Amino acid sequence: MKYISIILLAWMTFNRAGQDLYVCKNARINLFSSAPIEDIKAVSQTGASVYNPTTGQLGFSVTIRSFQFAKSLMQDHFNSDYMESDKYPKAIFNGTVKEPVDITKDGSYPITAEGSLSVHGISQKRTIPGTLVVKNGVISMEASFMVKCADHHIDIPSIVFHNIAESIKVDVSATYTKYNPTN
């Protein structure tokens, strides 16, 4: 809730009050790394997102420590050795959905979000393809993309080079509800 409040406050600063905003407090974000020795999977179900269908503005935020791994040792290494989660606690995307979407009509809309992805303290411009689905007034969004560790200065020691891929697959799934400031 804390992060959604921060995102909303930032959005309210730049957007006119009263515009329809949609929020998601439990976006699911999967990480997958395939390497010769082992595959590594992690999931967070606490991502926060805000979408403004009028302007196309889209924001995501996830706490790095919220990712859960099958092996606790992997999770410890992820947070302390690679992501430095105490120093860089969140990954954030701020951008715009380029295609206009009529949220009053049910349908599946291919979309492209352009913006900045900040991971490990390094921001990179990204163009992320995805799908926005409107069904019975419910908006959901899915996206899948690759992130190179080197793009965000995430160093992989040579001793574990065969354990961790140079690029991580990221899958995002979010279902939105209309923002109600009284909730």
Locations of the language-model features?
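Bacterial Sec-dependent N-terminal signal peptides
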Residues: M1-L21
